[in-house]
């Protein structure tokens, strides 16, 4: 009798845990700006096959029908630069460096590799823009070595990579995650990249917690990335949740 009660209790706990875990992937409402959009953001939960498939479908559509070439992603500046080099290379050596260094993260999945490979095959003129802090120091150091070997130690790329690595060091300093600092860095990095494009329309893929310009919630007294970008650029950001689009 006691065993039966315990079994039922455990099953109920598992059921409600599953409901809670699934519910974290909220199907948020889209946001359409009052002005003509030039920044199209999609919010995701990282590493899931169905979400990455939808993201590729959306990017290919904008690439082919709208002529977009600039894809902003929630990764490091230097990782995006390496992806841009890899798009022109005949092999996957650089992609494998990125993938192997991402071991233990949500980006270390076959689905993520497939996403990049499909872009290389079907959208080869894509230009990646990475606007996150330097999470994976090893990848940044690889790119610094690459730049040095190619006579680019005094380049802007080298300077930005060093800055990006230091952003990551500060975020992880003393074993504490400074989320407000990261969010502000993501905003600064996004603005730096976007302002070089002179108003060209872009698509961006970010974690859902960063991507909604109508989300007024704060983390450590700091608004999330898209809300800050809306305040900076005005109402030109369109947002849709990949969770909603795959329902």
Short names for language-model regions:
Residues 3-247:
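Compositional signal for N-terminal targeting/processing segments
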